[in-house]
Amino acid sequence: MSTYTRPVMLLLSGLLLLTLAIAVLNTLVPLWLAQEHMSTWQVGVVSSSYFTGNLVGTLLTGYVIKRIGFNRSYYLSSFIFAAGCAGLGLMIGFWSWLAWRFVAGVGCAMIWVVVESALMCSGTSRNRGRLLAAYMMVYYVGTFLGQLLVSKVSTELMSVLPWVTGLTLAGILPLLFTRVLNQQAENHDSTSITAMLKLRQARLGVNGCIISGIVLGSLYGLMPLYLNHKGVSNASIGFWMAVLVSAGILGQWPIGRLADKFGRLLVLRVQVFVVILGSIAMLSQAAMAPALFILGAAGFTLYPVAMAWACEKVEHHQLVAMNQALLLSYTVGSLLGPSFSAMLMQNFSDNLLFIMIASVSFIYLLMLLRNAGHTPKPVAHV
């Protein structure tokens, strides 16, 4: 049986369109808020509202899939995200956008969970890793193309919202021509998410996902604002964000190979150390291109390596619950990161964005170094 079946290819095609829309809004919303003369802490709170929606969406989607299946859950989540996009044009204001970004966050998280769960159920133990790798590549390529779009098209609010909403709805079309079946549903309800979060031997992976959420949530939510405060134009901001994301794309395959060859613990240590170096380099402002590149290459690949670490520590039938727990951990980090970073930037200096990223990374590095002699054999492979 082929790994990349027709339903899988159509699912990933729809995801690519949705990711384009998500990436464009994630870059432009902080800039639109700044243009409305909102304070830095308000920008951070709106970003956190989006990630709060992610948290709620992640918790709800399992129930939705069980009730209406993968296809209808995908349609519903796309419609919710489209509503969150269109709603931004109804009324411009802090409280209004706080609500609409929450709605968009719910829809976005539901899309992620539906697609990830569909791929898990479509695959086997032999090809599931390739399916999830394809998913991550599509996600990052879509994000990269979205950043390029920002640098090439008008960034005015009412110019962007119509085609972004249309792109979201177009992402539904591929799934109209296929049906994704849940062939292994009976194996997915045996383990609770709470049990996975409490699993001691997987704690490094869970903590890694939280740290990854803090780092990427802060970069996604506040890097455009940081560059804007430095006098960078909107078009150039899109370019620099594309540099950041492209580094994450290019880093996926080699870092994954290195983790398989030399062990995930060693690779995690090196990744976190490189994130610290990249953050320090950003403070100097002397070489932003290489600094952003190494930040992207190390930061964007931290989540999959930490996820693989945690998944090694569980039985095969627990993999889905563990993946859900890791996504929740990442979302919590994404929620905390922008809020705390925005408060520091508002009250002290924009440079504290990178000091905060370096600090939490250093704490995680200490956790990794404490486990120097603890390298248990893997139980499950995806």
From Swiss-Prot:
Residues 35-44, 100-101, 152-156, 225-234, 346-347 are periplasmic. The chain crosses the membrane at residues 14-34, 45-65, 79-99, 102-122, 131-151, 157-177, 204-224, 235-255, 270-290, 291-311, 325-345, 348-368. GO terms for molecular function: transmembrane transporter activity. It comes from the Bacteria. It is a multi-pass membrane protein. Residues 1-13, 66-78, 123-130, 178-203, 256-269, 312-324, 369-382 are cytoplasmic. The keyword Repeat does not apply. It is found in: Cell inner membrane. The keyword Cell membrane applies. Keywords: Cell inner membrane, Cell membrane, Membrane, Transmembrane, Transmembrane helix, Transport. GO terms for cellular component: plasma membrane. PROSITE patterns: MFS. Pfam families: MFS_1. HAMAP family: MFS_YcaD (MF_01149). Belongs to the major facilitator superfamily. YcaD (TC 2.A.1.26) family. NCBIfam families: PRK03633.1. This is Uncharacterized MFS-type transporter YcaD. It comes from Shigella flexneri.
